[in-house]
C-alpha cells in the first residue's frame, strides 16, 4: 500500500541524505549536531517506513542498498528544491544571497576581482564561496552544494573527462577552448636548443594531480607515440606548477593552458611559452573546452542564470 508523506517526519530525509553523503552514522551525526544514537534511531525509522535496510554495514562504512542508490538523485533534487523554497525571500532581495562556485584555478582568479565586484554591485549583501574544482565537484553540484562549476574538460577519445560522459543531470556550456602550452623560465637551457619533441622530453616535468589522477591527455598522446615524460614533481594545480616553473636554479618544465598567460602577467612571472611539439591531429586530442556546468534543476534559477551570463561576458575575450 502506498504510504502518505504526512506519516513521515521530513527531518528524517535530511538525515537520510547526510548518511548517503557521509556513509557513516558518526559523521552524519556530527554534521547534524546530534548524537550517533539519535542518527541510528532515525535510520531505524527510515528502514521501517521504506521497508528496506537502506544501508548495509561493511568494513569501509555504510553501503547503500539498490533502493537507496535508486533514490539518491530524487532525494538530492528534493533537498535542493526545499532549500530554494526556504530561500525564496532571499531571491526577492539581495540580502543573504549566497553564490557557491567550484572552479579551476587560476581560471577563476584571472577575472575574479571583476566578477566579485559585479556580484557585490548587484547584491551588496551577498556572500561568495569558491572551492577548487576537484574529483567530487560534480557530486557537489548534484547535491546542491555548488551553484556553478567552471573548469576544463578533455577531448582525447579515451579520456574520462569528455563532455559526452557528463551525467544526464548536468547541463553545460563551453565558453572557450584552449590548448596546453609549455612554460619555461626565461633563462631555461631548453630555450637555447631547437624546440622539438626530443628537447621537450629531455628535461624534467612538473605535472598536476587532476581529479585524483597524476596523468592526463598529454600523457595519453605521448603513450600512443611510445614516449613518456619524466615527471619529477607533481603539484595540485596549474597555479602552483607555473609558480614553480618560474623559480631559479632548476630545469623543470610546466604544461598549462595558454589562458595562463594572463595569470603570469598579473603576477609578473618570468615565463616563456612554447607550443607542444606535436602535429595537428595530436594537438586536437589535447584541446581543452573550458565549460560552465550546473544541475538541470537550476536551468531556470534567476540567480544562476545571471551568474552564468556575467561569467560569459567576463571571459568572452578568450573565445
UniProtKB/Swiss-Prot annotation:
Keywords of this entry: DNA-binding, Transcription, Transcription regulation
Gene3D superfamilies the record matches: Periplasmic binding protein-like II, Winged helix-like DNA-binding domain superfamily/Winged helix DNA-binding domain
Domain HTH lysR-type residue range list: 8-65
CDD domains: PBP2_Nitroaromatics_like (cd08417)
GO molecular-function terms, A-Z: DNA binding; DNA-binding transcription factor activity
UniProt-listed InterPro entries: LysR-type_TF (IPR050389), LysR_subst-bd (IPR005119), Tscrpt_reg_HTH_LysR (IPR000847), Tscrpt_reg_YidZ (IPR023746), WH-like_DNA-bd_sf (IPR036388), WH_DNA-bd_sf (IPR036390), YidZ_PBP2 (IPR037402)
Feature: DNA-binding region: 25-44
Family named by the database record: Belongs to the LysR transcriptional regulatory family.
Function statement: Involved in anaerobic NO protection.
NCBIfam families: PRK10216.1
Protein name per the record: HTH-type transcriptional regulator YidZ
Gene (name only): yidZ
Amino acid at each position: 500500500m502506498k504510504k502518505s508523506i504526512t506519516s513521515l517526519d521530513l527531518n528524517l530525509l535530511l538525515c537520510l541524505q547526510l548518511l548517503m553523503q557521509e556513509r557513516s552514522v558518526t559523521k552524519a551525526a556530527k554534521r547534524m549536531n546530534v548524537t550517533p544514537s539519535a542518527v541510528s534511531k532515525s535510520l531505524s525509522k527510515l528502514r521501517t517506513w521504506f521497508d528496506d535496510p537502506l544501508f548495509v554495514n561493511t568494513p569501509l562504512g555504510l553501503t547503500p542498498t539498490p533502493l537507496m542508490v535508486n533514490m539518491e538523485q530524487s532525494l538530492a533534487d528534493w533537498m535542493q528544491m526545499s532549500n530554494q523554497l526556504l530561500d525564496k525571500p532571499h531571491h526577492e532581495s539581495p540580502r543573504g544571497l549566497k553564490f557557491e562556485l567550484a572552479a579551476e584555478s587560476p581560471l577563476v582568479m584571472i577575472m575574479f576581482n571583476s566578477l566579485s565586484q559585479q556580484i557585490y554591485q548587484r547584491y551588496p549583501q551577498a556572500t561568495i564561496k569558491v572551492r577548487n574544482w576537484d574529483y567530487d565537484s560534480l557530486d557537489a553540484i548534484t547535491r546542491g552544494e555548488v551553484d556553478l562549476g567552471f573548469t576544463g574538460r578533455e577531448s582525447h577519445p579515451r579520456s574520462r573527462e569528455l563532455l559526452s560522459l557528463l551525467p544526464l543531470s548536468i547541463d553545460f556550456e563551453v565558453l572557450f577552448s584552449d590548448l596546453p602550452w609549455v612554460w619555461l623560465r626565461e633563462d631555461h637551457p631548453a630555450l637555447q636548443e631547437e624546440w622539438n619533441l626530443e628537447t621537450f622530453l629531455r628535461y624534467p616535468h612538473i605535472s598536476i594531480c587532476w581529479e585524483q589522477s597524476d596523468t592526463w591527455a598529454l600523457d595519453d598522446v605521448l603513450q600512443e607515440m611510445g614516449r613518456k615524460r619524466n615527471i619529477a614533481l607533481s603539484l595540485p594545480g596549474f597555479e602552483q606548477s607555473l609558480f614553480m616553473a618560474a623559480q631559479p636554479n632548476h630545469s623543470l618544465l610546466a604544461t598549462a593552458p595558454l589562458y595562463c598567460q594572463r595569470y603570469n602577467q598579473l603576477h609578473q612571472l618570468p615565463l616563456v611559452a612554447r607550443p607542444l611539439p606535436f602535429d595537428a591531429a595530436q594537438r586536437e586530442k589535447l584541446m581543452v573546452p573550458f565549460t560552465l556546468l550546473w544541475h538541470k534543476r537550476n536551468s531556470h534559477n534567476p540567480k544562476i542564470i545571471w551568474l552564468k551570463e556575467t561569467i560569459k561576458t567576463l571571459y568572452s575575450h578568450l573565445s
